[in-house]
Amino acid sequence: VIEIGFTETMVEDAIGQPDSVNRTTYSYYVREQWVYSEGNYRYIYLEDGVVTAIQNKG
C-alpha cells in the first residue's frame, strides 16, 4: 500500500522500481511521475522525493 507522504525509498520497498519516470524541473523543486505498467497502470507523483498524489488506471 502506497500513501501520500511516502518517500521514494518507501515506494520502491513497497512496489519496486517504476517502469519509467517522467521528470520536470522547476525553479524551486523537482516533480516526478513514476509509471508502473504491470497489470493496471499506476502513476505515483512525487515532489522533491515525497509522494503527493497516486493515480490508478483501469
Predicted regions and their residues:
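Residues within mature, well-folded domains
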Residues: 1-58
